[in-house]
């Protein structure tokens, strides 16, 4: 289910259609929250992935499970969209469609996605400081942070925004010192 070129090409028009529905009903942020939840569930649940990917499981069964999983809190527009994906046999692209939707939402709201890797878990205060720094560097109105921990960094953080990487880690500083001294990192 991870994004290949083909799945991206299939997912993009569906994500744009979902964005059109969300904008028409002023639900862009709610759909964004629901997409984030769906992505998290799909990444965590092998059983749900198996259900979605299985050609043996009937569409009616897939719909019943998805309806139960989505619950009453989900917008009927989003639920209908997901049921349409099942009918069109495009439900296997649900995760990619949600990713593409979030990309469109970030463009719409002038928000950047920052992948922050640190040597240890960041506190709320540190996350706010990183968010403020990213806003200053990019001029974005909002920042969506995806954090991960890599003890090999020794200390500090690396921040990836789009194709730019800001390396403020101790490992990166040691590598730069080594290179400046004529060594190989």
Curated annotation (Swiss-Prot):
InterPro entries: ATP_synth_OSCP/delta_N_sf (IPR026015), ATPase_OSCP/d_CS (IPR020781), ATPase_OSCP/dsu (IPR000711)
Gene Ontology MF annotations: proton-transporting ATP synthase activity, rotational mechanism
Keywords on record: ATP synthesis, CF(1), Hydrogen ion transport, Ion transport, Membrane, Thylakoid, Transport
Cross-referenced Pfam families: OSCP
SUPFAM superfamilies recorded: N-terminal domain of the delta subunit of the F1F0-ATP synthase
Cellular component, GO annotation: plasma membrane-derived thylakoid membrane; proton-transporting ATP synthase complex
Topology in membrane: Peripheral membrane protein
Protein's cellular compartments: Cellular thylakoid membrane
Principal localisation: membrane
HAMAP family: ATP_synth_delta_bact
Known partners and oligomeric status: F-type ATPases have 2 components, F(1) - the catalytic core - and F(0) - the membrane proton channel. F(1) has five subunits: alpha(3), beta(3), gamma(1), delta(1), epsilon(1). CF(0) has four main subunits: a(1), b(1), b'(1) and c(10-14). The alpha and beta chains form an alternating ring which encloses part of the gamma chain. F(1) is attached to F(0) by a central stalk formed by the gamma and epsilon chains, while a peripheral stalk is formed by the delta, b and b' chains.
Function recorded in the entry: F(1)F(0) ATP synthase produces ATP from ADP in the presence of a proton or sodium gradient. F-type ATPases consist of two structural domains, F(1) containing the extramembraneous catalytic core and F(0) containing the membrane proton channel, linked together by a central stalk and a peripheral stalk. During catalysis, ATP synthesis in the catalytic domain of F(1) is coupled via a rotary mechanism of the central stalk subunits to proton translocation. This protein is part of the stalk that links CF(0) to CF(1). It either transmits conformational changes from CF(0) to CF(1) or is implicated in proton conduction.
Record-stated family: Belongs to the ATPase delta chain family.
Protein name: ATP synthase subunit delta
Organism: Rippkaea orientalis (strain PCC 8801 / RF-1) (Cyanothece sp. (strain PCC 8801))
This protein's encoding gene: atpH
């Amino acid at each position: 289910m991870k994004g290949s070129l083909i799945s991206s090409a299939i997912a993009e028009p569906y994500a744009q259609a979902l964005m059109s529905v969300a904008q028409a009903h002023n639900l862009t942020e709610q759909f964004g929250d629901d997409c984030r939840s769906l992505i998290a569930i799909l990444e965590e649940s092998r059983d749900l992935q198996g259900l979605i990917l299985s050609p043996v499981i009937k569409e009616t069964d897939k719909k019943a499970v998805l309806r139960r999983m989505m619950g009453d809190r989900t917008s009927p527009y989003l639920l209908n969209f997901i049921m349409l994906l099942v009918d069109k046999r495009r439900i296997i692209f649900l995760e990619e469609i949600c990713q593409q939707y979030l990309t469109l939402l970030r463009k719409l709201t002038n928000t950047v996605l920052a992948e922050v890797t640190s040597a240890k878990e960041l506190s709320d205060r540190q996350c706010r400081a990183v968010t403020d720094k990213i806003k200053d560097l990019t001029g974005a109105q909002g920042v969506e942070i995806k954090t991960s921990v890599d003890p090999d960094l020794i200390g500090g953080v690396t921040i990836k925004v789009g194709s730019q990487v800001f390396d403020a880690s101790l490992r990166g500083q040691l590598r730069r010192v080594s290179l400046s001294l004529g060594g190989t990192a």
